[in-house]
Design a protein with these regions (language model features):
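Small beta-barrel nucleic-acid-binding modules, principally OB-folds
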Residues: 51-67, 72
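Short, well-ordered turn and helix-capping elements at secondary-structure junctions
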Residues: 18-22, 59-66, 96-98
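Generic structural signal for well-ordered secondary structure
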Residues: 35, 55-57, 85, 105
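Acidic-enriched, low-complexity/disordered segments with a strong bias for Aspartate over Glutamate
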Residues: 27, 39, 60-63, 93, ...
């Protein structure tokens, strides 16, 4: 399997509803909740790509460009952006759409770096 095929197969998509218990005082998705969801999707993507134990080592620039109101549907999309020897970068985008209208907007984008670990919790090669 080629690297591009492996990247395509590991792309992860999850849909969620934004309920009021996940919002802030502006009735939009709380940023910390968005980051938690993004890290989870990034973890799943990294694990599906490598099929190894993976841990988050950093979250790079996170851009919140569009509010995510309560009562909307979001899609989180995780995709491998770069593969190093023992680490990989995963881009996660959150798209928001109204429940009863067409269209959607990209609301949040972030890059997460993961390291693959062996059974001794030491960095291990991703591509063998």
């Amino acid at each position: 399997m080629t690297l591009e095929e492996k990247i395509n197969l590991s792309e992860t998509r999850v849909f969620k509803t934004v309920f009021p218990n996940n919002t802030n005082h502006y009735d939009t998705l709380f940023g910390g909740t968005a980051l938690s969801m993004m890290d989870e999707i990034a973890f799943i993507t990294a694990t599906r790509f490598s099929r190894l134990r993976c841990v988050t080592v950093s979250s790079d620039r996170i851009d919140f460009t569009h509010p995510i109101p309560a009562g909307t549907i979001i899609e989180l999309v995780g995709r491998i952006e770069h593969v190093g020897k023992t680490s990989m970068k995963v881009r996660v985008d959150i798209f928001v759409e109204q429940m009863y209208q067409e269209g959607r907007d990209k609301a949040v984008t972030g890059i997460f770096t993961f390291v693959a670990l062996d059974e001794n919790h030491k960095p291990t090669a991703i591509l063998r």
